[in-house]
């Protein structure tokens, strides 16, 4: 088993991950600023194929045009030297005080107009660098007090902004798909579009819903006490998984951004199994495996790069374990015993109507519910087999 990443693995990292200075609400930074050029080269060394960034991760907020052009040129040169690509870009609408009440949904109209301009500029840069997706995380879109935000009006303004972004992308020939990233809270007390379900429903109200999907993040979904793997499966079912952020999280608390698999390990295993093996034996998702984590505040730069490598190692280990799980004849027998594949058989026969079903006495009148109800499904055995493979016991 090789734990060396290749470009085919499509591992990517955000500049804000390895570049996090480890400043939090209770303490100052424990690491200095990381030059984006150095980050690109180091990520290439550990086997990443891509790097992503917010606009302000690369170019400091408020930089003049000449400074911006110089930074972008240097970054582009580093991409050329390393072969890394930019699969996704996003926009920082949460750090500067101007966004304290949001960007697209700020009560202040001038802020909303400024936010849209900021995103349009990042779309231009993303297209220039070959980005394939624009992620939209509305971290400040929300409120702490119910009386402070007209939610219906806020959703109108959200829709207005996203419709304009889609039109701009099409008119410029960018063809960028957009991925909305849900999160229930933090930094706002309550964030609009808090879960994938909210976001997918909202997308249906847009002028070009086919251009919009979601970016699901492990920690964000588990903060809502939701099952990440089930949510990813539903997003795939809707054909709305446009991007994915992988990290670790211990249940519904603050956003921990741990190394992938360093939180709910069993759910991480089932997720990799879904992404790599899918329901039919082939990959269910062909996009980047993007790590959105924060190197722990306790670590120096050596620890930063070790933790970055650990994300890759964890994914590849889980991928290998999931492959062994699926190849195990006892697992296949347990899946059959649990009737997992039978769920893919339509409940109705081809062409069958409700009249036909009502006429079928075996479906109800002659159905022995007590006998069927007495049978076990063997789900615990199946789960134990998964754990055995996860722990390397098989």
UniProtKB/Swiss-Prot annotation:
Signal peptide: none annotated. The active site is at residues 54, 57. InterPro entries: Xyl_isomerase-like_sf, Xyl_isomerase-like_TIM-brl, XylA_actinobac, Xylose_isomerase. Its EC number is 5.3.1.5. It catalyses: alpha-D-xylose = alpha-D-xylulofuranose. Binds 2 magnesium ions per subunit. GO terms for molecular function: magnesium ion binding; xylose isomerase activity. Pfam families: AP_endonuc_2. Keywords: Carbohydrate metabolism, Cytoplasm, Isomerase, Magnesium, Metal-binding, Xylose metabolism. Mg(2+) 1 binds at residues 181, 217, 245, 292. It is found in: Cytoplasm. Homotetramer. Belongs to the xylose isomerase family. This is Xylose isomerase. The gene is xylA.
